[in-house]
Curated annotation (Swiss-Prot):
Lineage: Archaea, Thermoproteota, Thermoprotei, Thermoproteales, Thermoproteaceae
Organism whose genome encodes this protein: Pyrobaculum aerophilum (strain ATCC 51768 / DSM 7523 / JCM 9630 / CIP 104966 / NBRC 100827 / IM2)
Name of a matching Pfam family: Ribosomal_S6e
Database matches in InterPro entries: Ribosomal_eS6, Ribosomal_eS6_arc, Ribosomal_eS6_CS
GO biological process terms on file: translation
GO CC term (a single one): ribonucleoprotein complex
Disulfide feature: none
Protein name in UniProt: Small ribosomal subunit protein eS6
Family membership noted in the UniProt record: Belongs to the eukaryotic ribosomal protein eS6 family.
NCBIfam families per UniProt: PRK04290.1-2
Domain of life of the source: Archaea
GO MF term (any one): structural constituent of ribosome
């Protein structure tokens, strides 16, 4: 019985929201790979997405905290010699390090799934994850400042 934390990012507002996903919805994520897209209708109980919106899987992390790596096939956990992200940010150019990563496929040992909302091309409505009160206040002040 898998349980995931889905971190859903909204490119229109720049905000992210975290959801807890349990069975039977969690079963639909098993076997998906980084870059796969799902129809946004499957999250209708958690968040209201615009018609035609999709969800693209961008990554995740395992129970031990190892990030999913798009270059490692399958639902495995292995060490790679990393020279850059994801999973390792070298302090100097050319440095490499042996790092533990997860494969690019979601399994029941994945705890967190990162995803982004993909809006239809003709969508012009408000963002699915709205701006918070602080951001709205900043926008309001920015609009008033040039008028003075």
């Amino acid at each position: 019985m898998p349980t995931f934390k889905l971190v859903l990012s909204d490119p229109m507002s720049g905000k992210a929201r975290q959801f807890e996903i349990k069975d039977p919805l969690a079963q639909r994520f098993i076997g998906l790979k980084i870059g796969d897209e799902l129809d946004g209708v499957i999250l209708k109980d958690l968040i209201e997405l615009p018609k035609g919106a999709k969800i693209r899987i961008t990554g995740g992390s395992g129970i031990e905290g190892a990030p999913m790596h798009p270059g490692v096939p399958g639902p495995v956990k292995k060490y790679i010699l990393a020279d850059g992200p994801p999973g390792y940010w070298p302090p100097k150019k050319g440095m490499k390090k042996k790092k533990l990563v997860r494969g690019n496929t979601i399994s029941d040992s994945i705890v967190q799934i990162n995803a982004v909302i993909v809006y239809p091309k003709d969508y012009t409505g408000p963002p699915a994850i709205p701006l918070g009160a602080k951001e709205l206040e900043k926008e309001k002040k920015a609009e008033e400042a040039p008028a003075q």
